[in-house]
Curated annotation (Swiss-Prot):
PANTHER family: SULFATE ADENYLYLTRANSFERASE SUBUNIT 2 (PTHR43196:SF1). With CysN forms the ATP sulfurylase (ATPS) that catalyzes the adenylation of sulfate producing adenosine 5'-phosphosulfate (APS) and diphosphate, the first enzymatic step in sulfur assimilation pathway. APS synthesis involves the formation of a high-energy phosphoric-sulfuric acid anhydride bond driven by GTP hydrolysis by CysN coupled to ATP hydrolysis by CysD. The lineage of its organism: Bacteria, Pseudomonadati, Pseudomonadota, Gammaproteobacteria, Alteromonadales. Heterodimer composed of CysD, the smaller subunit, and CysN. Pfam families: PAPS_reduct. One of its GO terms (molecular function) is ATP binding. This is Sulfate adenylyltransferase subunit 2. It is an enzyme of class 2 (transferase). It comes from Psychromonas ingrahamii (strain DSM 17664 / CCUG 51855 / 37). Its EC number is 2.7.7.4. Belongs to the PAPS reductase family. CysD subfamily.
Amino acid sequence: MKKNRLTHLKALEAESIQIMREVAAEFDNPVMLYSVGKDSSVLLHLARKAFYPGKIPFPLLHVDTNWKFKEMIAFRDNIAKKYDFDLLVHKNPRGMEMGISPFEHGSAKHTDIMKTEGLKQALDKYGFDAAFGGARRDEEKSRAKERVYSFRDKKHRWDPKNQRPELWNIYNAKVDRGESIRVFPLSNWTELDIWQYIYQEDIEMVPLYFAKKRPVVERDGALIMVDDERMPLKEGEVPEMKMVRFRTLGCYPLTGAIESQATTLPEIIQEMLLTTTSERQGRVIDNDSAGSMEKKKMEGYF
């Protein structure tokens, strides 16, 4: 007699859905952080599956830095309208008043004020006690040691030495008033898993992930796309049309593209099978020695 076995992707899907349902049942006011990227798109798809045929029982929160790619914002608004979920968009008002820019103020200050502080403001404003995120352990070394339930203190800080053990699929959801957790249902997924699942489930993606001729300039070894007129060109710089795509998405001045011919999901998957570099190599903030990912997370970053 044949036994029905879960495929690798089905097992990952089942684990993620179980985590989402458990958080929705145990916490008073959860939220899903929606950055519009591939991992967020998979999270949204899983949430729709987890609570089907009902509506997703928590809102989605986008912390907008005012420097996201135009295509990301258009995609966000279109998806929110299509699937009718509650979308909250927060911009740090202090940062907006100060005119914080990655060009004028640098990547570290921009990330701290517009992302980290903006996120903490939104979590405090709405009183969320659990926040789903799309981080995966294979992305970066500080994320590799983070729990599925990542506990944060009353100031949203992460202490890697003060986390709770997770035995099998048993999670400790007890928090004191004012404390919260960040929940990572995709912890055990890899970048390749994400793309294979997107292909299997036919999930809509931001076009920036697919190769296309785009205007870019090379700065410090990164291909930066000229997305709007706010990007100041250095002396002698002339945008060049190159066939590029993005493996990861963030603020456009801080996100490097890669040269690629992958215009379809199968081609992207084939590219992933052959790549030997991290997807976050294109993130300028990860190369900022003054602000490592672990330090950012200890200050309240995603």
